[in-house]
Each structure stands twice: as structure tokens, then as C-alpha cells.
Amino acid sequence: MSRKSIGEKRHSFSMRKLSVGLVSVTVSSFFLMSQGIQSVSADNMESPIHYKYMTEGKLTDEEKSLLVEALPQLAEESDDTYYLVYRSQQFLPNTGFNPTVGTFLFTAGLSLLVLLVSKRENGKKRLVHFLLLTSMGVQLLPASAFGLTSQILSAYNSQLSIGVGEHLPEPLKIEGYQYIGYIKTKKQDNTELSRTVDGKYSAQRDSQPNSTKTSDVVHSADLEWNQGQGKVSLQGEASGDDGLSEKSSIAADNLSSNDSFASQVEQNPDHKGESVVRPTVPEQGNPVSATTVQSAEEEVLATTNDRPEYKLPLETKGTQEPGHEGEAAVREDLPVYTKPLETKGTQGPGHEGEAAVREEEPAYTEPLATKGTQEPGHEGKATVREETLEYTEPVATKGTQEPEHEGEAAVEEELPALEVTTRNRTEIQNIPYTTEEIQDPTLLKNRRKIERQGQAGTRTIQYEDYIVNGNVVETKEVSRTEVAPVNEVVKVGTLVKVKPTVEITNLTKVENKKSITVSYNLIDTTSAYVSAKTQVFHGDKLVKEVDIENPAKEQVISGLDYYTPYTVKTHLTYNLGENNEENTETSTQDFQLEYKKIEIKDIDSVELYGKENDRYRRYLSLSEAPTDTAKYFVKVKSDRFKEMYLPVKSITENTDGTYKVTVAVDQLVEEGTDGYKDDYTFTVAKSKAEQPGVYTSFKQLVTAMQSNLSGVYTLASDMTADEVSLGDKQTSYLTGAFTGSLIGSDGTKSYAIYDLKKPLFDTLNGATVRDLDIKTVSADSKENVAALAKAANSANINNVAVEGKISGAKSVAGLVASATNTVIENSSFTGKLIANHQDSNKNDTGGIVGNITGNSSRVNKVRVDALISTNARNNNQTAGGIVGRLENGALISNSVATGEIRNGQGYSRVGGIVGSTWQNGRVNNVVSNVDVGDGYVITGDQYAAADVKNASTSVDNRKADRFATKLSKDQIDAKVADYGITVTLDDTGQDLKRNLREVDYTRLNKAEAERKVAYSNIEKLMPFYNKDLVVHYGNKVATTDKLYTTELLDVVPMKDDEVVTDINNKKNSINKVMLHFKDNTVEYLDVTFKENFINSQVIEYNVTGKEYIFTPEAFVSDYTAITNNVLSDLQNVTLNSEATKKVLGAANDAALDNLYLDRQFEEVKANIAEHLRKVLAMDKSINTTGDGVVEYVSEKIKNNKEAFMLGLTYMNRWYDINYGKMNTKDLSTYKFDFNGNNETSTLDTIVALGNSGLDNLRASNTVGLYANKLASVKGEDSVFDFVEAYRKLFLPNKTNNEWFKENTKAYIVEMKSDIAEVREKQESPTADRKYSLGVYDRISAPSWGHKSMLLPLLTLPEESVYISSNMSTLAFGSYERYRDSVDGVILSGDALRTYVRNRVDIAAKRHRDHYDIWYNLLDSASKEKLFRSVIVYDGFNVKDETGRTYWARLTDKNIGSIKEFFGPVGKWYEYNSSAGAYANGSLTHFVLDRLLDAYGTSVYTHEMVHNSDSAIYFEGNGRREGLGAELYALGLLQSVDSVNSHILALNTLYKAEKDDLNRLHTYNPVERFDSDEALQSYMHGSYDVMYTLDAMEAKAILAQNNDVKKKWFRKIENYYVRDTRHNKDTHAGNKVRPLTDEEVANLTSLNSLIDNDIINRRSYDDSREYKRNGYYTISMFSPVYAALSNSKGAPGDIMFRKIAYELLAEKGYHKGFLPYVSNQYGAEAFASGSKTFSSWHGRDVALVTDDLVFKKVFNGEYSSWADFKKAMFKQRIDKQDNLKPITIQYELGNPNSTKEVTITTAAQMQQLINEAAAKDITNIDRATSHTPASWVHLLKQKIYNAYLRTTDDFRNSIYK
């Protein structure tokens, strides 16, 4: 029985209702149907686009209005169909055949078009479908089928899969057609265009209630229908007048593979997106019937078609079409179904599109009968089956009706009676089961699932057959039994799947693990979700893809990079019923991992410290985990960063027995196996138990050894000497002589002793030490010091390796300070040795041993790599790379040394292997690659007999070592390998090595190898942050930035030009940073304060114009806790206290004046809180959050408070140096890492300075202290290198001298020569600065002996010192010496400075002129010798503020120049009341005389004669043997002290007016003495006048009586020096005496005066023996007529001076003067046997006599010296009548008269002299004893002056 649901529409079709055509045609069409419907194309992840091609002629006017005349552009998500319209361009000739007409006629002949009209309840009819019946088949078409379609071009139709946003392809080029545009339909609103019967279009939307639905075909067994009948159930159409949908379909499951039938399924809105499930049809053996469910209004009978039985199960295949997601796909081709078809109807409302569910009906037990069709009047209605009564009659067989007897009863013929027999039989029948369908909302729509398997029942019937003639004529049922069937229960799916969505609801960055956690919201109402993947993109690149195991759980994506912009997307896989489909969800999220934490990136060592017995000490191991870690902290050391002090959070025991120490600082992390983790942890070993003779504790070891010095002791663990506290006077850990054995290995493992502060042993006596490492030594002592022992006798040391720093005031060595008959083998030292001795006592410094002696001593197979500093200054002090002093048969063999030796004193007894082998030291098979500076690469002793063999080097040194063979590096390496040295430091400390780490930024993700330098520099700019951040900022450094190419040494925060060290107090004022590069340049970057980091102890600054940041390398703190602890202690320290003197090593009553720190000490103490903050900020990265750190640092300062104050004061006093606007005091005092030395501690260095002792801290030792204490931490070898390095950085465009001169407060005059060639040299000095007048260049020269001047000059607080520099001298003087009274006022302040400056300028010019003259006189070799630096001190005879003159001592604090310069320099000398000045050959000291006075300048030339005569003025010939130094100065080469002086000497200083009537010397000496020829010309002219006047005076006196002669003249004679060794007279002295009457009687002529050795009484003594080497002068106008000589040796003082000038005038400087005054002929004299014993030299020397000189100079020209002199007088007397006239101001008797007298003749001149002599005779005693009283003397001066003026200083002759 058929049921119809309420509102259900049914379409019934009946062949009888077709009003046009033949039934046969209609029927046959079902078998021949071949017209295909457009196939369903697959949906995919991309946008499906349909291209449908059609001709323009098919468009209506309305359609043409929708035409877009353009090409399709970009694909949009809403696109559906493009109708591509073409215009035909082909016009074929008319052949009488019209294809359209032909097609129509052909189609009309083979087809029948049936219009299906729907009748509505309101009586209206509408066209529903076209039923096209053809001979090839049937096609049910919707009314809209003829809309936008064209069969002409349909072959080109296509479906495209185009990504949204991609370009659509251009339409095809079709031959004969022109593309003109397109019409587009969209799918976003599911609107479809349909053309109604009247040609109008209407839009239909799925969302509207009247939208058209298509039908699903469902197969089921139905016992209600007879075999061969079928039922087609189609979902009815909703009511409404809307146009027909373009999409329409009918069921196609009954089509064969040859009867392709396409069906489109339109989905219920309630199930849109769900997959349609096509049930699998089981194999059926029974016919299948099709049932049509009809509506009340529209019924059409349908026919059934018999098909062969289908053997295979049915299932739904195919992809989905747009708009039908979730529906079952229509399979286009199916195999031929061979069974009858049964079509189930569709379900009622709410179940559209679903398989019909048949209600369960009772089993049908009656016979089946086939009903015919309905009778007229019942068309379209179901056949009514009348109830049939039970048949009780015998069964009769009816035949089939014959033709033309249809409907008539069959004619039964009568048959004869037959015999009837019976037969019993049993018939078993199957009772078919029924199928019950249950809707399952969890099962995909149209899918079926057998919930319960059906089972057929059985019916057993017993029959009795009646047989007649062998035929059964009747059968009678005897019995019947039944087994009921089990009904089959089938679940039918109603689920229509929709595409699930996965939305990212949350993204959490887990930055420490480089990962993210993503949370999702999966919306999957229909369980279509299959899987999903999280995809991470960097730009367009997929970098990470992770399967989402459970969308409900958080998804972790790891392995990401920091500072990379990422996008996270979700790639979804789902299934809507058929195949898996994929797409990328629209829910995305951008993110970037940014990680900024504090990380300790590089660790060389990590040390645990804790408090024990009221002191902090280091722990190498722990016996248990402490419960309270407040008193513990950690030191982290690195060569790349400052040492860090960090608090301990916890200490716990690990499972392996070690202890885990956790360091906690806010934001501190370390990298683990899966990313970063909080805090930093390291391990500490567990302490081992002690065993007899085996030790694991240093304290127990020392205690045991001290109790038994002859025992055997073995180490079983690494240990630290920090366990033991030493007494103040303790110089070693063990006292006494150790005779036992110390073994550093237990046989399986070697161990080390750490942290020695003193030598382990005092003495090793026959002891053995082997297999031991001694590490991190930090020993300092005022006694002999070494790591292992102070002394060793007959000891054996093997396989001992030492590493650390050792310093001392006496002998210093790596292993043993002093050894005798000791063997040291296979051992090594690595580190620093500092010998800071300040005296001249014996000491030796060596890398292995200081001094080793004895034939049994051997140093074999040792290695040294060390920096050694020494103050070796004499033969008692040595330094060597391996041994300082090697003597008495001791041997060094098979050993190698590398490193550097710095000798602050420049003494050369320093060697790369050994300082000295004197005597009998032996060296064999050694290699030295040591930079020895002023020493030698192998041995400091270079005597040829030294026993040094097979010594090699591959480096170059300043000095050539006679024993060194130069080899290549490869050769050196091979030689060292052959030595077989196996000692190593690497075999111990394994537990500590586990805590080491290093970073290589180039190995990190996103790092670029070529940016290695940039990463290193960014590390400097932000040292605390994690390495990934370093790489991130490093990648932002421009390739043009210097940070990209050049390595940084340090970064210094600044405020303008001020270095900022107190960062906490000035953090907001920091506005730039200084970048110090390794190429010795600096650059500056502007910065602005950005913020405090999360850990507020780290602060950040933005760098202007850059993408990176800056953070100072300091945990910013005000250090309140520490300062509160120590401030009062520091403020109570006094400089002169006993405690301070104890630290200095000075006696309680010792004065500390020579420190010159008084003023600065008080200034530092007054501001100690600020200084302390600077020290702590720059010292280490001190984190003050831990109590242990605060207490440790506080105790360290308090325990060393005196040393701390001394060191801090010292640095503030001597390093307060300016470089233009830049003051470097803070940089020098606190920034010890400025040169990249990150291992240096500011606090430790300052304390070490204070502890270095009084001698080291003396102001005069600033150069030595730098070399010993600061060079290694500052990175420059000398203090000069240090200040020059700063100059190069901060004033690169200035020279050292320019900077020095600008920044010292001393008044400096550098007087360059007026000689062009000299000035050129001085202005362009050579590399050795030989010609430079720059004060800095000169005091920094290697030859300068007063280098301690540097820092006092640079730090002078005021102008109180002057410096005058010229070609040969460097003069220093104090302003206080010239505090004169001017106009009754004692000069001070600016007036004094102006006064002194003026005098300095004048004196400097005079000194310059003096040396210019000498430069002009000398040969080229001697000229070069003038370029030197002889120090001149102006003395300490100063005046105080009251004008009182006194000799100041260096402790005088009232004289600024003493306190600030002369005192600190340490250059002082005692007062000498009898000395104006003195010299010693290399310096000049003024005492009574003042350098800047006019007379003082003359004295200056006097002293410089002493410093220059022998080697320079005498051109290397030396002084003539037998003549003292003073003969060469006063009265010979010393400049006159005035141009008015009557002394026979040269004016080399003063300039005067040319027409000065009083001058007696040249008015411009530089111009006049511009060559030796000019000098001779001048002197010859001078002697022309003097000889003439002397002859006239002789004539005037010889005319007098003998009494006058006797008073006027004196006789000069020789006395002799007796050579007692050779028993002979040698050198002469002069004496004068009065004449006897007999002698006077012989004086009758000029020649008689010469022959009788007569001199004038005037200007000489009446009677005197002139001591040799005296201060004498010769008067130009008091004649010496004598020609006295000495044939036995050198002449006396008077005659020497007189004859020297006469030779200068006659023969010149080189041909007359030098041969006479110098030892030019000494070699010749000595060779000839003329010699004498010199007590000065202690040997025989040449005896150069006057006779030899005379012979050599005159070469036979004269017969004697007297003959020479007579000739000189005669030469002038012969020309006197040719004298040029002169005019003088002269009036006898009136000395001040201006009366002019013109002298025109010699006679007139003679007359004037006669008159003057007569005047003197009247007052003869006075006139001859007091030169100014002599009128002759005055007249001669006036005549001489007149000729001097008229001849232009004798440039012209006095003769006509």
C-alpha cells in the first residue's frame, strides 16, 4: 500500500497521457536513450570555474545587456560560471541544406517532445519539464534547459581549478568565431539564472523556501510490488511560482554503462556541506521494482524496464560539484545492471534527498497475483486490488489466452477418467525476511549500515499429491510448520557533512625554548575532520610543519629562530564523504620570537666561594650540600668579559655524587638541551676521604708535611691553597728544609694545587717533587719568590707545571728562586713574572729558576711561555726566559722559551734563554722566540767565550745575538718536537673543565660567517644579553660600519667629553659612547637612555642612527651596602699612620715625603664614596643582590684599606692627564679593561699598587712602577707607550710633542736653529727623533736618563716650571728662583710668570745662537754630535714669597716647582757655596749662578764646553793630554759674558748695536761666525789691531827707564809636572814674577820682550804660580809678549790660552787651533815613544809636546814659537803706516768725555799711546794693578772698538 506524506509532491507519468506521438516511440526511447547530461566535475581546494562557450545568436536582449566586453581577469572565490560569447565570422555558401532545419526535421522524425504541465491547487498550470522522446532514448529536461547554452560550441566547455587571486586564462581562439565578451554568474549567494517559458530570467537562492530540490534514487526490496513493476520516488517541488531551476536531475542508478545518465544533486540547506552517502546495494536475485511517489495534483504513470541482474554491490563514487558539497557524487558510467530495478521513493518533508524509509509491514502470506492496468476513468491512480476470497475449489490450470481471446476464459476440454494415485511429499519454502530501515544521524547521508543481519524463515509443508497417469492432478496440503524470519535492520544515514574549520584561538610564545604553543578551536559538526598540520612560514617559505595530533590540545612548534617574522597557518585535511580534501585555513597569526635575557656566554673558569672561619675561601669540592647559601657566591671568569660575582641560590647533591650549584640572578638563563632555562648551574666535585699518605685537602697536606718534612706525600685530589691563611711575615707555606717527596699523581690521575699566594716550600733539600701541577698562582713577596720553592739544594724536580703570576722585590722565578746542584726536568712555567726591585742589589729573574749553580745542576726539557718584567740596571741583576743567572757548570738543554721580557731600565744583561752565563754556564740545544726588547734573544752575556751551542730563533729582535741561528718557524717547530718535552697543564682539573663553555656566534641559526667581527663587537656593546640577541643585532650592523670590519677592545660611556665611570649616578646623563678599536682608533656614537631592563641592574641605551643598542658592562648599583660597610674605615686611614707605613714597608719614623701624595690623598679621602663607586662599577660585574658578594667585597676592601687608599691616591695623582678636551684620569684609574684586558680587576690592581712598597710608590719611580705593575694590565710596555696610545686615540692629528706642549702647564720654549739645514731637520725629525727639539720627544728618547719627568710634567697643577730646548741641551728651572723684586715689589702670580717667560725667551735665543756657531765651525761628523739632550738644571736657590733666598730641599712643600716637579722627579743636588755651576760631561747644574741671567748664559757656555769639548768641539780628538777641563772653558771657549768684555774670547751669545762705542766683540756672532774661515778672518783682524797696539805700547814703555819697565812688565815661566814613573818632567804650569834688574836691562826692543818671555803686569798678578787647570783669562789689551812653550809636554794655562788664539788667528780653527788644543797628534806621539803615565787613566798616555805641535802646524815655516811671534808683530808693524783712519771719543784725563779724536796715522796713534802711558806712569802702581785705572788700557779699547766698527767686525781690513 502506498502512502503519501503530508505536503509531498509526486509526479506520475503515464504513456496513455501522451497526446502526441506514438507510444512505441516513447517506449523504445527508454531502451535507446543515449543523450548524456553534463557531467559533474570535481570540487577541489581551489576555486572551480566553469567556462561555457556559446554563440551570440543564442542570447536574448536581456542576456545581451549582461554581456561584459572584456577578458576575464582574476579568479574570485565567488566565481562560478563564465558564459563566453562568440560571434560567428563564417558564412558558408547556401547549398540548399539548412543544418538547423535538417537537424530539426531529423530530430522531429526520431523524437517526440512531451510538455509536462503542473496543475496547482489554485488551478494555475505551469510548464514543469520537457520530456524528449527519441529513438535513441529519453531525456527529461527542466524548463530552463534551453537557457544560457549553446550546443554549437559546447564541445569547448571546460571546468578550471584556479587559485583565488590568480589570473584566469584567456578564452580559446575558435576558428570562424570572434570572442566578444562574457556573462558571469557567482556562487557566493547561490544565485542561479533560469529562463522561464516566456524567456524571462529569475534568480533562485538555496536559502529561499521555494528553491528547487533534486531527488535521490534509493533501492530497496518491496514485496508490495509485483515482479517487473517499479516505483520511482522523486522529491517533489515546493510550491511557488518561481522560475525553473537551471539545475535538474533524475535518478540514474538504473542506467547501464552504455546508457550514461548524469544526475546533479542539489543539497538540503540543513545538510549543506555534508557528504552524501551512497549505500552499497547488496547482490539481489530477485527483481527490483520502481515505485513512483506522486503528489495529489500531478500523477503520471511510469514504466519499468527489465534489466539483467546486477551482481556487484553498489556504492557512490565521484567528486562533489560546487554548491553540492556533502552530497553523493553521481557516477557517470556504471556496469550494466542485470537485475530488475527497484526504486524507493524520497522521504517526506525534512528528509529531502535522503533514501526513503519503508515502514515495516507484515509478511504477505497470500498467493501473488498480477494486476493489470487501471480502467478508464482511473488514469493515474493506483490499481485497486480487490479482496480475493479463499479458493476452496480444486485447482485448475488455466492456459494462457490465445490471441483475440484476451480476457476470455480458457476452454477446458473434457478428459477421460484416470486412475488416481497418491504420493506424500514435503516442500520446504523460504520465508523472506523484511528489511527495517532506521535513520542514523551519525551515518553519512545515503550510506547504509546493516545493524542486524536479516535471516529468512522456513516454511515446511507436507503435501499429498494425486497422480493420474503419472501426472499430479491434485495436491493436498497435509501439514504446515514455519520458522519465522529474522527481519534485517539497516541504518540509513541522514548526515550531510560540512567542511570543518580550525581556528587559531591563542598563540603563546615560549621564547626560552624557541617554540610556540598554539591553541585551536575545531568546528566539526559533522565529523568531517581528518587531520591538520600547523605550518610556519617565513615570508612565503614554509619553514616548519607539524601534525596536529589533537586539535583540542595545545600544539607545540619548536626549533624556531629568534627575531624572525613568522606566520602560523593551519593546513586542513577533511572528508565530506568520498575523498580526502585539503585546504589552508583563513585563520592565521603573525608572530616573532624575541628573547632578551642575561646569559653567561663564555666561561674560562667558575669558582665557588664560601665563608669559613670568618674568611671567604674557594671551594674545589664539597663534603655536603650547605643548607644556607647566603654566604656563598660564585666568580665567573672569562677572557671576553669582566669577571662576574654572582649570588648562589642553592646547592644540591646530584645522583652521581657531585653537587649542583645554582646561581640566581633576575633574568639569568643558560642554554639547555631543549632551549634556555632559568638560572645558571655548574657542578662541584664531592670531597674525597683522606687516606694515610694520600691527601685531598691542602690544609691537611701542609699540616702533615710541616710535622714530618721527610715524609712521602701523594695527592689524591685537586686542592686549593685558599684553605690556609698565611701570616703577614710568612714567606712560604712550609718553613724549614723539606727532604721528603711530594707526588702529584696517585698512579692513575694527576692533580693540581691551586691558588698559592707564596712559595709552597722555603727550601728543598735533597727532596723530590714530581707529577704536579701548580695553577692560578698569585704570589707576591718582598723576598725571593717562586711557586714551588725559594731555594733548592740537590733536589730533583720532574714533570712539574706552573701557571700564574709571581712578583717580588728580589729574585723572582717560575719554579725555584735559587738552586744549587739541582735537576729540573720536563717542567714548565706559563704566566707572568714581575721583578719590581728598586735597588742595585743582586737579584735574578728566570722563567724556571732565578739562579742555578753547580756542575750537577741541569735544566732539561723545560718550556716557558711568559711575560717577564724586570728593573735590571747593573751587572748584579739579570733576567732570562728560562734562567736568570747560570753559573759554575750548570746546564740548560733541550728547552724552549717564548713570550716577552720587558726591562724598564733598558739594561741589556737580559736574554731570551739566560740573562748571564758568567761564569761557566752552559747552554745547548735551545730555542728562544722571546721578544727581549733591549736584551738579546739567547743570552744577555755576549762575550765570545760563552759556552752556548745550538741556539736557534725564528723571531727578529732589536739586537743581534751572536749565538742565535735564525730558522724558519717550521724548522723551529720540528726542533722543539725533537726535544721530547711532555709536561702539560691539561692533565689536571678535569672536574673544573666540565664547567667551561665558549660561544661561536657564527654557528647559530641566522648567523653569517662573514659577520664574525660584527657579532664580537655587538657582544662588547651589550655584554650581558643572550647570544641570539647578539646575532640579531649583529645582523643589523651595516657592512659599511666599522663595527663590521674592525674588532672592538672596549666601549666607554661618556657625557660629552667626560668619561663616565659612576654609571648609576650618571646613567641619565650619558649621551655618547666611545668605541675603542683594535687598530688603535676610536669612534663615537650618540646614545640616549632607553630603559632599565627587567633586571634593573642592566640599563639600555638607544644608539642614534643604528639598529643596535648599548648596555654598560656593569650591574648598575649604588653599592650602598658595600659603601656603608667600608666608608668609615676608609675615611679613617691617614697617610702617615703606622698602619700605612707598615703596608709601605717603611719604618715607623720614616717620612713619606718622597711619595708626594699628601695633597691628593686628602682629596681622594674627601670624596672616597664617589671613588669607591667608580672602582666597584668598573671593577667586575658585581651583582650586589647576594649577601655573600657584598660581604666578600666589603671585607676585601676593609682588610686592605691602607693599600686601597694608597693605590687609589697614586692613580689619581699621576694619571690626571688631559688630551685636549678629554681628561683620562677616570679612564686610566678605573677602566683597566680599556685595552681589551677583561681579566684585570680594578680593585685588585689598586690594592696591589698600594701593597707594592715605598720604593715602588716613590714619585720618582713612576716609570718603573708602570713597567712592573701596570704594563701587563694596561697593555702597553712603558708609560710612554701608554700616554702615546691615548694621544693617538684622542688627538690623532697631533704629534706627541704638540699634545705634550699643549697639555703641560710648564712653560716650554723649543728654540729651533736659524741655520736652514738644521731647522729643516728639526721641523721634520727622523723616526729616532734625533733632531727633534720637542720636549716630549727628548724625555721619551731611550737615551734620556730622567724619564720620571713625564707624569709630573703632565700633571702640573700650575705654571711653576720652565723648560728650554735647543740643539744640544734641555734646561729646567723653577719660577721661584726668579721671584725678584721689581720696583720694590716681589713678583708673584701673572707678573712673575710674564717676567720669567721673557727671560726664558731671551736665554733660549742666546743658547740657540751659540750652537748655531758651533754647527758652522765643525766638520759634518761633529755637527751631528751637536744633536743631543744634555740636561741643565737651574738649581734650587729659590726665593720665598718674602723674597728670602735659600736652597730648597725636595721636601719643601712651600715651593710649587719643588713639590710638583723637581721633588717627584727626584732630581736634586746639594748647595755648593763656591760654585756658580758645574758639569760632569752629561749634565749641568747651576748653583749660585742663574741660567736666565746674562752672565748665567755665559756660564752655560762654560759648562757646555766641559760637556762638549772632547767629543764635539774638538771633533773627537779629545783634550790634549796634560791639559785640564777648565783650560778649555773660561778664557778659551766660554763665551764672553758681555760684548764690552776685554777678555780674549769669542762672543757666541750676545747681540749688540753695530755702532756701540763700548763693544769689544762682534755685534752679531751668528752672522759673523758662519764658518771656520769667517772665524779665522775675524780673529786675524782682531789680532791685526791687538798686535799693532801691543807693539805701540811696548815702544812707549821701552822708551822709559828701567824702574818703569820693572813695574810695567813681568816675566812668565814654566814649572813642570814630574812623571815619577818615568822619572821626567812633563806638562807645564805658568808662573809670573817681577823682573830682576839684570833682566830689565835686557829689555830694549820688542823682540827682547818676546825672547825674555815678558808679559804685561796689567790684568795679571804681580807674582803668582798659576795652578794648572785654573780659571784664568787673557786680556785683549794687556800684552803677552812671551812665546813660552813646553818642549816636555803641554803648556801652562796662561800661555796655552794666548797661543791658542794666536794660532786661530793665523792658521784657523782646523789647521791651527785644534792641533794645538786637542789630542790630535796623540797617537803619533805615543807611537814615537812620547808618553807619560796618567793617574787618571791608570796607564801610559801620549805626551804631546809643544814642539810636536809646532812642527806639525808650521811645518818648518818658523824656527821657534818666538820666531812665529816676532813674525806676527813684524807683519803688523810693517803695515801700520797703512792703517785706516778712525775716530774715537777720547780725552786724556776725562774717561767719560765724548770728545772725538780722529786718528789718521800710526804716528798719531803712537803719540796718543805714549801720552796715555805717561799718564799711567804717574800712577803706575795703580794703573798696573787695577786695569780700569789704566789710560793705556782705555785708549787701546777705544781704538779697537773703532776698528771693529769701521771694518764691520773685521770683515774688512784695518789697512788701506
UniProtKB/Swiss-Prot annotation:
Annotated protein name in UniProt: Zinc metalloprotease ZmpC
Membrane-crossing residue ranges in chain numbering: 97-117, 130-152
Topology in the lipid bilayer: Multi-pass membrane protein; Peptidoglycan-anchor
G5 domain: residues covered: 417-496
Gene name as annotated: zmpC
Entry EC no(s): 3.4.24.-
Locus of motif LPXTG sorting signal: 92-96
InterPro entries: G5_dom (IPR011098), GLUG (IPR011493), LPXTG_anchor (IPR019931), Peptidase_M26_C_dom (IPR011505), Peptidase_M26_N_dom (IPR008006), YSIRK_signal_dom (IPR005877)
Native source organism of the sequence: Streptococcus pneumoniae serotype 4 (strain ATCC BAA-334 / TIGR4)
Gene Ontology BP annotations: proteolysis
Composition-biased stretches (Polar residues): 254-267, 286-295
GO cellular component, one term: membrane
Extracellular topology ranges: 153-1856
Main location: secreted
